[in-house]
UniProtKB/Swiss-Prot annotation:
One of its GO terms (cellular component) is cytoplasm. Keywords: ATP-binding, Coenzyme A biosynthesis, Cytoplasm, Magnesium, Nucleotide-binding, Nucleotidyltransferase, Transferase. HAMAP family: PPAT_bact. ATP binds at residues 9-10, 17, 88-90, 98, 123-129. Its cofactor is Mg(2+). This is Phosphopantetheine adenylyltransferase. Gene3D superfamilies: HUPs. InterPro entries: Cyt_trans-like, PPAT, Rossmann-like_a/b/a_fold.
Length: 160
């Protein structure tokens, strides 16, 4: 069974992330969305909420599982029994970092391959950072995120 692990902070999960998950779900028997705790990134949403939002966005995909983690990714991928890391590339600017990460992961988990997918053209410009900035300034984020994510962002910024 081919199991792919798609790690990220997903703060929040966007339509670009969802697009990659949908395509991975067609390519692999089992897709694991691994939501990283990432405390050094100071995420807007707590880990549990990011996991729940990712589950909501992907609930229509029976071969997709969402889990949170706070350990070293190379250890976590082995715990999950995955044999592939999935990473998204939006632009050439993403490549250098992702290339370094893939090579580091190869050193730490040599049996796990890195696979890069590009999002559909209509999602290639979306980033979680930009979505958070737009939401914080009261902009319409409905084109960029699932309705449940938009609701969570809007609720979060109405409190501030």
């Amino acid at each position: 069974m081919n199991r792919v692990l798609y790690p990220g902070t997903f703060d929040p999960i966007t339509k670009g992330h969802g697009d990659l998950v949908e395509r991975a779900a067609r390519l692999f028997d089992h897709v694991i969305i691994a939501v990283a705790a990432s405390p050094k990134k100071n995420p807007l949403f707590p880990l549990e909420q990011r996991v729940e939002l990712a589950r909501e966005v992907t609930k229509h995909l029976p071969n997709v599982e969402v889990v949170g983690f706070s350990s070293l990714l190379a250890h976590f991928v082995k715990e999950q029994g995955a044999n592939v890391f999935l990473r998204g590339l939006r632009a050439v600017s993403d490549f250098e970092y992702e290339f370094q990460l893939a090579n580091m992961n190869r050193q730490l988990a040599p049996d796990v391959e890195s696979l890069f997918l590009t999002p559909s053209e209509k999602y290639s410009f979306i980033s979680s950072t930009l979505v958070r900035e737009i939401a914080a300034l009261g902009g319409d984020i409905s084109k960029f995120v699932h309705p449940a994510v938009a609701d969570a962002l809007n609720a979060r910024f109405q409190k501030n």
